[in-house]
Amino acid sequence: MSSNSVVYWGTGRRKTSVARVRLVPGNGTITINGRPGDNYLNYNPAYIAAVKAPLETLGLSTEYDVLVNVHGGGLTGQSGAIKQGAARALCELSADNRKPLKTEGHLSRDPRAKERRKYGLKKARKAPQFSKR
């Protein structure tokens, strides 16, 4: 990465994961926490596809390198956070990118998270075994 190249930033969140995504003009390599993207995501095709989805929606998958710093949660949450962060960075790149990314759902925050445990129950909704007598 040269010192005068333009860098586009985006932050994504999913479950308890937070991803800070940088887009740099390049050849399409994905680096997550200093490791190659497919290696970091355990070569799981669903996770890799989720990370690449915003770039492929706009046809820019070979024009920008994706540099990611992500923490918290597991691979599902992290790949979702990276997807949202990359989409936000692409919106920063050009305002015209917003509409196709929004229609594909890459910009919306997934609100699903682990439900808290309630007192009197074993888990969030699992009650102790009922005994009639």
From Swiss-Prot:
Top-level taxon of the source organism: Bacteria
Region described as Disordered: 98-133
Gene3D superfamilies: 3.30.230.10
Keywords, in A-Z order: Ribonucleoprotein, Ribosomal protein
Keyword Ribosomal protein: yes
Pfam families for this protein: Ribosomal_S9
SS bonds (residue pairs): none
Compositional bias segments (type: Basic and acidic residues): 98-113
Gene Ontology BP terms: translation
Stretches with biased composition (Basic residues): 114-133
GO CC annotations on file: cytosolic small ribosomal subunit
Molecular functions (GO terms): RNA binding; structural constituent of ribosome
InterPro entries: Ribosomal_Su5_D2-typ_SF, Ribosomal_uS9, Ribosomal_uS9_bac/plastid, Ribosomal_uS9_CS, Ribsml_uS5_D2-typ_fold_subgr
PROSITE patterns the record matches: RIBOSOMAL_S9
Xref: HAMAP family: Ribosomal_uS9_B (MF_00532_B)
Family statement: Belongs to the universal ribosomal protein uS9 family.
Protein name as catalogued: Small ribosomal subunit protein uS9
Gene field: rpsI
